[in-house]
């Protein structure tokens, strides 16, 4: 995992998984941002799903559930997520990134 250096913010988002025959892939695999920058993470899934969640694991190992979003758009402060179930993808948007955003981000489907 990338470490915070000065005003740089390291995000690691590479996750490829297969659950019950559903392949899940995130992009980009690695992302380094300047503090204050915006970014988008994408989660593609190979089959229709009932549930989709976005998680953040901070550098101290704490796992945080960001969004439960099987479809539509939700926002929570500087973070928002959109899931388009019919096209089998979800997006996580981080606006005005801060050093506290550093960590591992991943989506989980069911």
UniProtKB/Swiss-Prot annotation:
One of its GO terms (cellular component) is T cell receptor complex. It is found in: Cell membrane. InterPro entries: Ig-like_dom, Ig-like_dom_sf, Ig-like_fold, Ig_V-set, TCR_alpha_variable. Keywords: Adaptive immunity, Cell membrane, Disulfide bond, Glycoprotein, Immunity, Immunoglobulin domain, Membrane, Receptor, Signal, T cell receptor. Glycans are attached at residues 38, 44. The keyword Protein biosynthesis does not apply. Alpha-beta TR is a heterodimer composed of an alpha and beta chain; disulfide-linked. The alpha-beta TR is associated with the transmembrane signaling CD3 coreceptor proteins to form the TR-CD3 (TcR or TCR). The assembly of alpha-beta TR heterodimers with CD3 occurs in the endoplasmic reticulum where a single alpha-beta TR heterodimer associates with one CD3D-CD3E heterodimer, one CD3G-CD3E heterodimer and one CD247 homodimer forming a stable octameric structure. CD3D-CD3E and CD3G-CD3E heterodimers preferentially associate with TR alpha and TR beta chains, respectively. This is T cell receptor alpha variable 22. It comes from Homo sapiens (Human).
